[in-house]
A protein has these predicted regions:
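Extended, low-hydrophobicity segments enriched in charged/polar residues
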Residues: 1-83, 102-142
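Alpha-helix N-cap recognition
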Residues: 96-101
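Double-stranded DNA-binding cores of transcription factors and transposases
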Residues: 84-88
Length: 142
């Protein structure tokens, strides 16, 4: 069985490393996230949703890296919660999770970033999804 390999160095990326946050070496500071688990998530997502649409798929898939100009980071916030973010969008901003970054990666794979459906691209095109208004707590209902 042969393996299809995705190396994002071979793709045109719109990522901008100048927009990355400052990374620190100490615990609690923002650090680059190890890529191995993220690349497995990306591979599984591509296999589940997109493999046969735009890739020459030969039974298995391997993803080598993130698109150039992008970085996944991890840090611990003031409340002690571990926070994962992704950076490098050409218009700034950050994805709040790796999963919300995946639609942009898929757009890069397709070569069609102009029609990307990720949260940041929709926001910059003025098509952002409005925040959902939560219902009032039961004790405030009359």
């Amino acid at each position: 069985m042969s393996c299809t390999t995705i190396d994002f160095a071979d793709y045109v990326s719109d990522g901008d490393s100048r927009l990355w946050p400052i990374l620190g070496p100490n615990r609690g500071q923002r650090q680059a996230q190890p890529l191995a688990p993220l690349l497995v998530v990306l591979r599984d997502y591509i296999l589940a949703h997109h493999a046969l649409r735009f890739l020459p798929f030969n039974g298995s898939l391997r993803v080598l890296n993130l698109p150039p100009g992008y970085i996944a980071t991890v840090y611990t916030n003031a409340k002690g919660r571990v926070v994962h973010t992704c950076h490098g969008h050409p218009r700034g901003g950050q994805w709040a999770s790796f999963v919300s970054f995946i639609p942009h990666i898929i757009a890069i794979l397709r070569g069609d970033v102009a029609r990307c459906g990720c949260v940041l691209c929709l926001r910059h095109r003025g098509q952002g999804i409005p925040a959902r208004k939560l219902p009032r707590p039961f004790w405030q209902i009359r």
